[in-house]
């Protein structure tokens, strides 16, 4: 018989840096999950990801207080800012450009995000990533 799902918890945690402090501790604590067990498992699973990148995670909590979790790829905006070498996007994206990304960088980000995106093909995903870049005030070259 399958376990009864009690809750789904969605968080963004820095890769390799999960610790019991907020936001992780309170979110898991209110469902009775072993916080340190999650932190150790999450940090082990995100070893291959660049340290510090915000990584979305969906935690499924069961009625017996056990849990499973799925890590996703970092948000496209974070990957675009890293590729362009800027700290933040533009406050006025249509008039004020803050950086540039090449078509090759957009392709690389689309391939990274392919597992989480629901695009028909890589070209559709590239267009989606390029749209995100433009809405952040980045110029897409190529």
From Swiss-Prot:
Domain of life: Bacteria
PTM info: One or more lysine residues are methylated.
A Gene Ontology term for the protein's cellular component: cytosolic large ribosomal subunit
Keyword Zinc applies: no
Any GO MF annotation of the entry: large ribosomal subunit rRNA binding
Pfam families per the UniProt record, alphabetical: Ribosomal_L11 (PF00298), Ribosomal_L11_N (PF03946)
UniProt keyword terms in alphabetical order: Methylation, Ribonucleoprotein, Ribosomal protein, RNA-binding, rRNA-binding
SMART domains: RL11 (SM00649)
PROSITE patterns assigned to the protein according to its UniProt record, in alphabetical order: RIBOSOMAL_L11
Gene Ontology annotations of biological process type: translation
InterPro entries in UniProt: Ribosomal_uL11 (IPR000911), Ribosomal_uL11_bac-typ (IPR006519), Ribosomal_uL11_C (IPR020783), Ribosomal_uL11_C_sf (IPR036769), Ribosomal_uL11_CS (IPR020785), Ribosomal_uL11_N (IPR020784), Ribosomal_uL11_N_sf (IPR036796)
Role, per record: Forms part of the ribosomal stalk which helps the ribosome interact with GTP-bound translation factors.
Homology family: Belongs to the universal ribosomal protein uL11 family.
Subunit structure: Part of the ribosomal stalk of the 50S ribosomal subunit. Interacts with L10 and the large rRNA to form the base of the stalk. L10 forms an elongated spine to which L12 dimers bind in a sequential fashion forming a multimeric L10(L12)X complex.
Alphabetized HAMAP family for the sequence: Ribosomal_uL11
Name of this protein: Large ribosomal subunit protein uL11
Organism field: Photobacterium profundum (strain SS9)
Taxonomy of the source species: Bacteria, Pseudomonadati, Pseudomonadota, Gammaproteobacteria, Vibrionales
